[in-house]
A protein has these predicted regions:
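Short beta-edge strand/loop motif at the mouth of beta-sheet-based domains
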Residues: 21, 41-77, 161-162
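K/E-rich alpha-helical interaction surfaces of small helical-bundle regulatory domains
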Residues: 32-35, 39-44, 139-152
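Hydrophobic ligand-binding cavity/cleft-lining segments
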Residues: 1-53
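A generic structural micro-feature
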Residues: 14-16, 74-78, 102-105
Length: 162
């Protein structure tokens, strides 16, 4: 059995398929995790220190709704955006991902949330990178971000279960 504070995420990049698979077990209910994945709370966990920092997020969380995130990456501003393809709270969230101003380069992010031993296992699948290098970099970024998500939600879980 893992500790409540064990927030290690794992990510692997399949460079040939241009696919990232990542997972983390979060000490929180699926409903709470889903909210963190689909709200402005993204600005708290969607970070990789020294590489990127998400500062703003907006979204219309419904099938066909749009989302937009902005921040800084290596000292330069960035904007990511996409469309929600599936919204099945608190089990599954699927959206497209593209850098604003870079039409035609669209990838897809799928989050699956499963209750496991009083926690929520988040499994992420990000498919459709423009290059192998980008795929490899995103594997590191997703691992860092999912670890941060688990770290942020663990203290809430401990408070709720005293």
């Amino acid at each position: 059995m893992t500790s409540i504070n064990d927030t290690r995420a794992r990510a692997v990049a399949d460079l040939a398929e241009r696919l990232v698979l990542a997972s983390v077990d979060v000490a929180a209910a699926p409903e709470r995790v889903f909210h963190a994945l689909a709200s402005k709370e993204i600005t708290e966990w969607w970070v990789r220190p020294g590489v990127f920092d998400t500062r703003e997020w907006t979204g219309d969380v419904r099938r066909g709704g749009r989302w937009r995130a902005s921040g800084m990456t290596r000292g330069e501003p960035y904007v990511q955006e996409g469309e929600f393809l599936e919204v099945d709270s608190p089990k599954r969230l699927v959206h497209t991902w593209e850098r604003a101003g870079n039409p035609g380069v669209v990838s897809t992010v799928t989050y699956l949330l499963e209750p496991v031993d009083g926690r929520t296992r988040v499994t992420l699948r990000h498919l459709g990178f423009a290059s192998r290098d980008m795929c490899g970099a995103f594997a590191i970024g997703w691992e860092t971000s999912l670890e941060r998500l688990a770290e942020i939600l663990a203290p809430e879980f401990l408070l709720d279960h005293r």
